[in-house]
UniProtKB/Swiss-Prot annotation:
Its EC number is 3.4.21.105. SUPFAM superfamilies: Rhomboid-like. It is a multi-pass membrane protein. The lineage of its organism: Bacteria, Pseudomonadati, Pseudomonadota, Gammaproteobacteria, Enterobacterales. One of its GO terms (molecular function) is serine-type endopeptidase activity. Rhomboid-type serine protease that catalyzes intramembrane proteolysis. It comes from Salmonella schwarzengrund (strain CVM19633). This is Rhomboid protease GlpG.
Length: 276
């Protein structure tokens, strides 16, 4: 199987698939963050790419609009649900993605009800030498958030990036990225600011770095991040470093997380190339 391209609009993807069916080429659509087009017979790849270039130039051409009828498919296979937003949330996130989101929400509720300090005493990075053997503390800091905007921003990125990694590469890969980046970004951040910090952003930056570089070096992995978004991430690090917006940011965790993600993607793509 070879991934040809992705479309943000599922109906556009279906139009191209239907047209290629009339040309004797069978493509399939897999719905993830976008509608991914896959080709089973890789010997037809060059032909498909030529037709794709023509399609992108003029997707409204009548031959494409009529393709569903010619291929005998009057039903695109799309299903419209009463709550499409909730359906999208479910479809684009695996169990690990959901478990982490739920943990963050529950911890945020607890912090709102009984106070930040009470929760941090149990979940923060070890703040006393006698706590260094409480191993969970090296990871549970990622569940603590200190404002509604803080948790919403992090969970949105976690769902978008973590969900894509889990759906494409499996729950194990997401767990490995999360555990390593939580540990290393937390270690760096406590060197910067001490143990009283929290948030999922170090892991989010690791996912940004991983998804972007993995997509650039290994397009067949099926994950990618637009270059504009990685530029935004870098600008956000700069803004936090120079305190442009007067907000307290975990700059050490952000930088460490990004480096961890890039390093892991580099290693994984090296291994992928050795196998091919």
């Amino acid at each position: 199987m070879l991934m040809i391209t992705s479309f943000a609009n599922p109906r556009v993807a279906q139009a191209f698939v239907d047209y290629m069916a009339t040309q004797g080429v069978i493509l399939t659509i897999q719905q993830h963050n976008q509608s991914d087009i896959w080709l089973a017979d890789e010997s037809q790849a060059e032909r498909v790419r030529v037709e794709l270039a023509r399609f992108i130039e003029n997707p409204g051409d009548p031959r494409y609009l009529a393709a569903s009828w010619q291929s005998g498919q009057t039903n695109s296979g799309l299903r419209y649900r009463r709550f499409p937003f909730l359906a999208t949330l479910r479809e684009r996130a695996g169990p690990v993605t959901w478990i982490v989101m739920l943990a963050c929400v529950l911890v945020y509720i607890a912090m709102s009800l009984i106070g930040d300090q009470t929760v941090m005493v149990w979940l923060a990075w070890p703040f006393d030498p006698v706590l260094k053997f409480e191993v969970w503390r090296y990871f549970t800091h990622i569940f603590m958030h200190f404002s509604l905007m803080h948790i919403l921003f992090n969970l949105l990125w976690w769902w978008y990036l973590g969900g894509a990694v889990e759906k494409r590469l499996g729950s194990g890969k997401l767990i490995v990225i999360t555990v390593i980046s939580a540990l290393l970004s937390g270690y760096v951040q406590q060197k910067f600011s001490g143990p009283w910090f929290g948030g999922l952003s170090g892991v989010v930056y690791a996912l940004m770095g991983y998804v972007w570089l993995r997509g650039e070096r290994d397009p067949q992995s099926g994950i990618y991040l637009q270059r504009g978004l990685i530029i935004f991430a870098l600008l956000w690090i700069v803004a936090g470093w120079f305190d442009w917006f007067g907000m307290s940011m975990a700059n050490g965790a952000h930088i460490a997380g990004l480096i961890v993600g890039l390093a892991m993607a580099f290693v994984d793509t090296l291994n992928a190339r050795k196998r091919t």
